[in-house]
Each structure stands twice: as C-alpha cells, then as structure tokens.
Amino acid sequence: MNFEGTYVAMVTPFTDDGNIDEEGFRSNINYLIDKGVTGLLGAGTSGESATLTHEEHRKVVEILIDEVGGRVETVAGSGSNSTHEAIELTKSAEELGADAALVITPYYNKPQQHALIKHYQAISDATDIPIIAYNVPSRTGVDMSVETIVELAKIDGVDAVKEASGSVNKVSKLYKALTKEGLEEDFNILSGEDGLTLPIMALGGTGVISASANVDPKRMVLMVDSILNDDYTRAQELHYEMIDVIDALFIESNPVPAKTAMNIMGLPAGPLRAPLTDMKDENVEILKNALKEADLI
C-alpha cells in the first residue's frame, strides 16, 4: 500500500464520566474529512491508546471505520510491547476492515535491533493488513536504526515507517539506503514530527501522521499538498504559519495540549485519562496565544 498525504493521529474524546464520546468522535471524523485529509488514525498515541481497554480499543477502531465509510483511508493503532498482543491487535484491525495498522516498536523492554526485525516479521506473517512501523524513541526507549528499517522494508506487508526520532539527518541516510536497495518506491517514509514534516518530505518522505492536525488540519493538508506538488515556497509559508502552534501543542505530553486546544476551540475532546492531567495554567496561556496568532480562536 502506498501512503502519501496527511494522516491525522486522532484524539479519543471522552465524556465527563470517562467513557468514549462516540458522538464527539464521529463529529471529529467528519470535521477532519471535510478539511481534506488523506486518512485517519484511531487508537494511536494521540488517542491515549495506552489507557484504553482492549474493548475500548476495538470500539474506537469500529467507530472510525463505520463513520469514515470508505471516504478516506483508515489506520488502526495496534502496537504493544508484547509480540503476541501486537499480533492479536493487528488481527483485530484487519478483521474490522482497517486499511492499515500502525505498529509502534515495543516499549520499556528495549528489544535489540535484530529482535525488532523478528517482531515485525511475526506480525506480518500472522496478518495480511499493510503495516506502518512506528519509530518514536522518546516514548519507547528504543530507536530503530537505518539498517533495521531497511530490513523491515524488505518484509512483505511492512509498507512504511512513521519516523519520529527527530533526526533529519537520519531520514537522509534512510532514504539514501532505501534507494541503494531499490526500495524507495515501495516503502514510504512518513513524518512523525509535525515541525519537521517539511524537511522530511523534502528529503524523500511522502506524508505525515500528524497530531497537530487535530487542531489545524487545513494548513497541514495545504502544506503537505504543496510539497507533493513541488511548491516549496507555499509550503514554507504554511510551515511558518503553523510552527508556533505545533511547538505549543508539544509543550506538555501529547495529547494533553491537543485536547486542551480542541476544548478551547469547541471541538469534542473532553477530559484526559489518568495519569495524564490538565495543563499548567502558564502553558495554557502559551497555547491560547499561539492559537490566537494562528487565527484558530
């Protein structure tokens, strides 16, 4: 499967009593589709997947696929620090009809590089759904090397990587290594760092899985489309229009600022699930100022 464009890592809205806000989630899905996004990710990091029960995880993916109704691509988060559990979650995503699965590297147990390859190979062997590997060492404690990602690209069914190591140099080396192996046409690099999406795409990336697009989808879509159309002047303008909001959205742990911003903007988000909690007052003011300057409130 080819991944190109703007994918939104959706938040999971909750009601005041802590349940999934199905009506709000469906509303957000339609709001984002109306803004022109390529695809939507449910039950990812931005969706507070770590604190969803298995039943809630499945419900989020079910609602997503049902409400989208084939209008855009659907991606289900299905990673775990247990290979067995990751296989079961990925099977569930496939059974529910998701177009792809986003599989984060195992976290906390810090598997070796060769173990990461075996992990993704096992998931691919057990399923037929396209897999996007997710490299985010700041959260997992393990950073997939360029060499490891190239090996993943050789696995049938692993079609892309969401690269969130924060290193543009690494993306350069990765694209060069993929090209050397003749894999660059069949394996996509997707930005996992909203503020680095422009340089990552300029170096061979084909899109973004964006948390900030929950808050400012229109500009992100326009920037990504501009890059894909080789209009880097317009892309640069949009990047600078967004960058202060992007920075403010990561001033505390994602999705704390994103849900705060959405609540301020009147979009369904609701409360956070413990252990995440409300933003510090001074950071809320920084966020509000960024939203005002970007004409989002």
Swiss-Prot record:
Pyruvate binds at residues 46, 209. The keyword Cytoplasm applies. It is an enzyme of class 4 (lyase). SMART domains: DHDPS. Pathway: Amino-acid biosynthesis; L-lysine biosynthesis via DAP pathway; (S)-tetrahydrodipicolinate from L-aspartate: step 3/4. It is found in: Cytoplasm. Its EC number is 4.3.3.7. The active site is at 134 (proton donor/acceptor), 162 (schiff-base intermediate with substrate). GO terms for biological process: diaminopimelate biosynthetic process; lysine biosynthetic process via diaminopimelate. GO terms for molecular function: 2-dehydro-3-deoxy-phosphogluconate aldolase activity; 4-hydroxy-tetrahydrodipicolinate synthase activity. It comes from the Archaea. The record marks 45, 108 as: Part of a proton relay during catalysis. Keywords: Amino-acid biosynthesis, Cytoplasm, Diaminopimelate biosynthesis, Lyase, Lysine biosynthesis, Schiff base. It catalyses: L-aspartate 4-semialdehyde + pyruvate = (2S,4S)-4-hydroxy-2,3,4,5-tetrahydrodipicolinate + H2O + H(+). Catalyzes the condensation of (S)-aspartate-beta-semialdehyde [(S)-ASA] and pyruvate to 4-hydroxy-tetrahydrodipicolinate (HTPA). HAMAP family: DapA (MF_00418). Homotetramer; dimer of dimers. NCBIfam families: dapA (TIGR00674). Belongs to the DapA family. This is 4-hydroxy-tetrahydrodipicolinate synthase. It comes from Methanobrevibacter smithii (strain ATCC 35061 / DSM 861 / OCM 144 / PS).
